[in-house]
Amino acid sequence: MIEFDNLTYLHGKPQGTGLLKANPEDFVVVEDLGFEPDGEGEHILVRILKNGCNTRFVADALAKFLKIHAREVSFAGQKDKHAVTEQWLCARVPGKEMPDLSAFQLEGCQVLEYARHKRKLRLGALKGNAFTLVLREVSNRDDVEQRLIDICVKGVPNYFGAQRFGIGGSNLQGALRWAQTNTPVRDRNKRSFWLSAARSALFNQIVAERLKKADVNQVVDGDALQLAGRGSWFVATTEELAELQRRVNDKELMITAALPGSGEWGTQREALAFEQAAVAEETELQTLLVREKVEAARRAMLLYPQQLSWNWWDDVTVEIHFWLPAGSFATSVVRELINTTGDYAHIAE
């Protein structure tokens, strides 16, 4: 299995270094649900601003404040402890009376607004996230500037970030031990983390192998293509390659890579043979995913940061703004810009 640090770069390995997250204020995330609260219903959507505390900790504190069970407070996604993050929590509080959440106090956390909502906020139910990052002590401004320009045109690999695999790769190691021993895993969280790490690692490896090709975005017979921003896909045929290539070049269509699991992967012929060869040696992880009935899926191979802009404060400090769809990793963007340094170089989102 290819180590995350050794995955293929789209724009070549960065020439310089830089400090990511010298302090939490250098990594700002604003969650974009893609919808507004209904204004009525048995749930309450609470928009919070937090710094120095993780999402689960805040959710548990909110449940305690509302005198409800912790499982009655949900969220669309975990946000990093070591960052300034804005996100929504959802508490199930039936009844006409609206609690006064302005009285909710927690160090490092502030309630920005709250309103009634009809439905529970479920994991993954967000449109995306807006990021504002500050990179400090940049050693090669010219290289970073050119890479930012190139990313606007060509995007970045849509890798799952290193944090998906746990500190020191612990989630992936857990998946490998599980695959090798076949011992039942009772802890639901461990099961989820380990299976997710296994599938993500296989996806990253397929993308890394594809990026070694001279023309990364060249459509081949049997590729699974998806409309930009959509989840469904269709299979490319030889007769359509020229037209499909035009649409890929125009960013109307995205080439996808497999999230291996049980069932068909989605590609056919040449593309399927390539994907199978890319992970042929990872039989244990593939067997684990099939055994645990994790369905195969697809994910775009490349990621195009939206609304990308940047501002150099000086020759060694740059502030970068961009928006990413749900499930994408800001660290996969930063990875193409600089070789990161600092305690939190691999901890984000």
Curated annotation (Swiss-Prot):
Chain's role: Responsible for synthesis of pseudouridine from uracil-13 in transfer RNAs.
Catalytic activity reads:
uridine(13) in tRNA = pseudouridine(13) in tRNA
The regions listed as transmembrane in this protein's record are: none
Q: Which residues form the TRUD domain?
A: 155-303
What is the name attached to this protein's record? tRNA pseudouridine synthase D
- Family classification: Belongs to the pseudouridine synthase TruD family.
Active site at: D80 (nucleophile)
Q: Which gene encodes it?
A: truD
What is the originating organism of this protein?
A: Escherichia coli O1:K1 / APEC
